[in-house]
Amino acid sequence: MKEGADVPLFRNDMQVIVVFPPAGIGDLTKEALIYQGAFRATDSLGLSFCPIFPSSFKDGVETLVQLVKSDVVGRKRLIIAADYEYSAYLRRAAEEGDVVDSDSTKLLVLDGDLTHPDIYTAYVPFYGTMYKAGYVASKMTDVESVKIYIANSKYRYIREGKEGFIDGFNQNKEGYFDVYDFSTINEDDTEGFYKSTLAYIYDAPECSEFYDMVLPLCGETVMGFLRYSREYPGSFYTVGVTADMSAYSSDVPFSCVEHLDRVLVSCITDWSKERLAHHRTFGMDEGWVELVIPESYSSMLQPVADEIHAQAIKLEGRYEK
């Protein structure tokens, strides 16, 4: 910090508590961005920040419910559930009266499907940016077939990502898409988010032989594909998801970047000023999510992305209604 800069007065009477999934925050993940945003916001505002890493989802849910139910005197708390997996449990808890909105405690969930008067929600839609990505991919002359890996189709942003990409690709030409859902056997299975080693050993070699591009809507599992394409350049293209992944492989022509860190800063700032919206959508029309094309591909792909940008925004608006 520069000499003479204003230092925010630390306020112990306002606390932000973030309950993460059992797997932690990982690399290039939504959880990592949530942590960064929460830390940056609380640090700049002088608020107390308490990250919690439970040993299991059950433990995480119990922690969330206990935090919301427990009343505090002389302190205001914003409790954030940093994983979609918590949504169903929190909805059930709210319906049973275990989650109650109060002046002292607010519960924020990053989920567009969760609606309940006692729960605040924020959501970053994925359809428009993925539509744009699919359209750009269709303009690449060496891309005809795409393997799409899905960690779990019950998550809205994953469904939006898959549908948006396919719709955008087919807008220009008909492509071949092979979709694999890790949760086919058990709809509650979330292991598909954490299979980077298996992706590197088994899935990536298959993709190298049969597919031109991989769209990994599966959290940290993407690291297995990036590692393979880095070690065997030219095997297949990988679409970056959540963060800009072009530094991890020269075969990442573009990334669908979610600025979840900025979303957290916005939500925490609004809460600290007592203006937190009950639900807010952070869309591509305002730059909360965008398609990032690295310099090595920009001369070829950026004009295509610019060409379809307005239509992608319009279609996302229709899709979200």
Where are these regions (language model features)?
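Periplasmic-binding protein-like
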Residues: V18, V73-Y84, L108-L110, S208-G219, ...
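Hinge/cleft segment of the Venus flytrap/periplasmic-binding protein
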Residues: S266-K321
